Amino acid sequence: MIELLSESLEGLSAAMIAELGRYRHQVFIEKLGWDVVSTSRVRDQEFDQFDHPQTRYIVAMSRQGICGCARLLPTTDAYLLKDVFAYLCSETPPSDPSVWELSRYAASAADDPQLAMKIFWSSLQCAWYLGASSVVAVTTTAMERYFVRNGVILQRLGPPQKVKGETLVAISFPAYQERGLEMLLRYHPEWLQGVPLSMAV
């Protein structure tokens, strides 16, 4: 059984923070080969300047350890799209309490092919619970197509651009999407946060 945590940095134990850092390092640096500089003093952990007290973490846990994660950042503070990838947006990136950013999204449970979408929908639902009406992200056009195939409502914030061999695009998602709520209600109702019964039927 997979459990899901949704916590701020201070809500995670030191052991969980270390395991999350190792998982992110394995996925984003070792496996995907991202050219990112970690701010962690520990060699095999990946954290950056956007991991701060206002950050919200979504962490999927199996008996073997972390098997997925995502990160939510308020756009009223520093965040990836605004501070690193603003050129992907046709207009100024948002700075709005009703808009959050999703980043560091990954899933790696081979025995659950739907885990990636479950974590994605849970991240949107968590953002909605925190007061977001929309969620922005920087991703590849391949991931954009993956989201569309899985029924995700989204819109581009600017045209795709080639960056270091990858075609990146900035996109925005409505935080509340019935498709995602239906999936979570079917498989993991215990993951839902603050959903009124009238919205969950």
UniProtKB/Swiss-Prot annotation:
Indicate the segments annotated as coiled coil, or none if absent.
Answer: none
GO molecular function annotation: N-acyl homoserine lactone synthase activity
Q: Which GO terms describe its biological process?
A: host interaction involved in quorum sensing; signal transduction
Keyword annotations: Autoinducer synthesis, Quorum sensing, S-adenosyl-L-methionine, Transferase
> Which EC main class describes this enzyme?
transferase
- Does Transferase show up as a keyword for this record? yes
Recorded catalytic activity of this chain's protein: a fatty acyl-[ACP] + S-adenosyl-L-methionine = an N-acyl-L-homoserine lactone + S-methyl-5'-thioadenosine + holo-[ACP] + H(+)
- Which E.C. number(s) belong to this protein? 2.3.1.184
Pfam entry (one): Autoind_synth
| Keyword S-adenosyl-L-methionine set for record | yes
Q: What top-level branch of life does the organism fall under?
A: Bacteria
Q: Which family does it belong to?
A: Belongs to the autoinducer synthase family.
The name this protein carries in UniProt is Acyl-homoserine-lactone synthase
Name the encoding gene, please: rhlI
